[in-house]
Amino acid sequence: METPRLLFVHAHPDDETLTTGATIAHYTARGAEVQVITCTLGEEGEVIGDRWAQLAVDHADQLGGYRIGELTAALAALGVDRPRYLGGAGRWRDSGMEGTPARRRERFVDGDVAEQTAVLAAAIDELRPHVVVTYDPNGGYGHPDHIHTHRLTTAAVEAAAWQVPKFYWTVTSDSALRTGIAALTDVPDGWVTLTADDLPLVGFTDDTIDAALDLGAHSAARVAAMHAHQTQITVAPDGRSFALSNDIALPVDATEYYVLARGEAGERDARGWETDLLAGLNLR
């Protein structure tokens, strides 16, 4: 049987863990070849706590380099041997949220799209993934780098000589998010809970989702990867919730959801969802 190959394309260190961490751990545990390409170093991230606060952009501006170590440790927890960066580490800078001022180095969203597409298409041709995963058109919650990553990955999948059999978007399930938030009854002091309607996340309805992977067996690996991103993520002691620098509590969902953007779906369950991103592929 041919070894399955999956490629995840993400904008910043920690995105791979927050959106697809359990999926990555699941497929590495199955013996698949899993690669993660990260488009920036995440230099513009807000830093949690005081220990590494001086690394932030308005101080030493060394956060991006530090986050290479965090990403390396997180990927190791998920079973991936090393990080890969689009164009090499530091080629394009984290663009920040909408309204973030331009820095001295070219921002990811301002980069030459043709060059970026060619670099990613070349990586696809090198790695020959059976499955490629990136964000939905809104980038999950509207971050400019996530939206740009979606557009770039879509273009690269089209431009690559290697024909990617299945191309997915990682998405948030609206119903699962609401259920998870309702269950957050005991969160650490200082954290706040919001309704799903008050969050910037764009949830997908059940009838628009194509795949749901129930990955409770890999929750521990995902939580370990979250802990590795200590400048960006705080995990509750019970491991059931987490918060970013804004201290908004979010559930750790044991299921990760996907929309199939290109390719043929495999077998679906009674809910109408695939339960394996490799479903329908002939890897013999």
Swiss-Prot record:
Keywords assigned by UniProt, alphabetized: Hydrolase, Metal-binding, Zinc
Domain of life: Bacteria
GO molecular function ontology, one term from the record: zinc ion binding
Enzyme class: hydrolase
Record text on cofactor binding: Binds 1 zinc ion per subunit.
InterPro entries: GlcNAc_PI_deacetylase-related, LmbE-like_dom_sf, Mycothiol_biosynthesis_MshB
Pfam families with a match to the protein in the record: PIG-L (PF02585)
Role: Catalyzes the deacetylation of 1D-myo-inositol 2-acetamido-2-deoxy-alpha-D-glucopyranoside (GlcNAc-Ins) in the mycothiol biosynthesis pathway.
HAMAP family: MshB (MF_01696)
Family: Belongs to the MshB deacetylase family.
Required cofactor(s): Zn(2+)
Catalytic activity from the UniProt record: 1D-myo-inositol 2-acetamido-2-deoxy-alpha-D-glucopyranoside + H2O = 1D-myo-inositol 2-amino-2-deoxy-alpha-D-glucopyranoside + acetate
A biological-process GO annotation: mycothiol biosynthetic process
UniProt: Zn(2+) binding residues: H12, D15, H146
Statement: the UniProt record of this protein carries the keyword Hydrolase: yes
EC code(s) of this entry: 3.5.1.103
Protein name: 1D-myo-inositol 2-acetamido-2-deoxy-alpha-D-glucopyranoside deacetylase
